[in-house]
């Protein structure tokens, strides 16, 4: 691009001035941005005063935001320092951890964390978006849009966001919308207005994102497609010529970058995209590295949100690609975007929600603010002569920061991360066929969580069973659950499993896993119980509406205390946030908290000097905090790893690093037992630990009741598995049966046949403990070893085991038994004659167990 003459003149004038270098950069970058946004090739084309006014206002706005953000950050730092020194006296490490990922300690505000705020913000944004589509009667149209409709909707979004021309302004007209279908216009309008409201919300919280059409979908990039750009575009790597001076990781990386860049450049608005870029190739390589590393998903603070302005050179804001038209962007999206337009929309919402939760709790500069809090607490302890070794470094907390800012979803080495994700994905769909059967222990955990809140243990378990027996809720109660913040896994799987949870997976692997977990019934099981848990809690809280906080039962008081719900907040909730269903039952209604009065909000905050807009922000924050209680407790009732457990399991390591991948394989299938120990066991330990709400008896009783019920449900799960395999239940009179039931109920049952196969060599037991990947490798090595030694039978058996245990979908509980009886037992007998009789003898000896029907050894003699 040729350098603009006007820009050159201004730069020369600034060089001769006494203005500081940093200031000169800000002025020039602002002028370039304003000219690009106004599509000006020369300032002479318009009144120079208009440009000057715009430049001045933008620089003033940024200064104001920087000042306000600094004040808010200081308030956050001081508030947390006081909270930790007061509430976590003697365990300051736990107090610092609680800021990010919550704590099980029974202390005021212990679970009022960044991670809960993020989860709640995402869930409520999803709910608000879905309800907006439903209100217009176009939710199904939006959900089921084909490619042609997506393109039209996307184009209409751009037209709705267009600024009126001078002629249109004089005539009082709005920009023209070419689409005539009113339903499509409604879909586009909801998307545009939601995106714009979300942008304004983030700006109100400290960001500085300029108005741009479709902001929320422009986060959309599929790291897998971007990294394999040549293949995605149907190009051969050998035919791509690259700049020899390009600083990529290797020649293939450079060729894929070149293919991606050449395609993207075709639709880019160069003047606007590269307004502040000194070198276009460097700019585009920076963008490419960010996309391949999945760094666009991170929540690093106000100035780093996608699209946020920062005029200082080298600033950390994410680079923006501006396209000439909506069709140009959509053409790019079809090749390199996150699936459909709908997925791009939800993906943008999730990233925005993570940013909102982060900023609300840790301000505009999260890591810097956390370090100020830590150092401030450390300083006070040193002055008191206390030991500060536990909090002397940021390193122990980094693993949790990497979870909440999204670093663990970024990639260091793409190839290693991709192959690791594929390996673990294959493991999931070939070894978790019986996961829903193993999940019967969820019922015990469900009951223990409700008991923790003051409800009835066995009654809550019965309620959960009734929910499963109903198969699905009525539309009315589904709407109530959605309003509380419930998100069905099936709705968000496409996006969440690819960018937000666990491994980053390609579209194909995501679809395979989504189908598999539907077929093994785990999606239905989890959604049903989580939905019922949220409805049950909302109904339980509503039943207490006539009681003041100090009149509630002690367990519920303790629960509200750890989420910072005091008497003033509870009075507002019980007065304002109630709704009655058609069957007469009452529920907490989160959406009603939008309508609380300014006076009530002032009482909650303890101040009356806030503006209308600031009060509205606080009302939304309060609504999200109440929803956060229900969402957070629902993952304790239907256990899944929270941010704290994820940090411990991953140690904050990136995918694509040697240790990150090793830990990924080591931790596969261990999420449930780890969460069980940390979240359920930790919950009860919170009462045993020293503190203002210590109740050792309650903690011991809670652990005991949970353990006994888990063992009982473990036996039920084992028995169901045996029945599905055509076996009798194990003899309950044997001690070994109850040890196995304890292991099953405690989470080891998720391994299915991985750990408890009848056929395995003793050397592979250790491999099973360290993960299914190691088990498969052990079987392959055993087969090779036996083959070298000439032991064909053993080699064949190990090889068959390695293959049969890694066939996707073959492990589905209703397929596995049929496969075994049709051909599996025949193969086993062929590979190792007499093996079926040995299995039957072992079953009788170890478990006092027989087959229900004809013994496999009678009808299967091998081929």
Where are these regions (language model features)?
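Low-complexity, small/polar and acidic-rich linker and loop segments
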Residues: 2-197, 201-207, 211-231
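Acidic/polar, low-complexity linker and loop regions
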Residues: 147-176, 378-419
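Short linear interaction motifs
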Residues: 176-180, 287-291, 296, 302-330, ...
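Short amphipathic alpha-helical coiled-coil/interface segments
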Residues: 181-199, 393-405, 423-426, 484, ...
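Domain-level detector for long, ordered catalytic/regulatory cores in large eukaryotic signaling
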Residues: 214, 220, 262, 269-274, ...
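Glycine-centered flexible beta-alpha turn that most often forms the glycine-rich phosphate-binding loop
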Residues: 581-582, 589-673
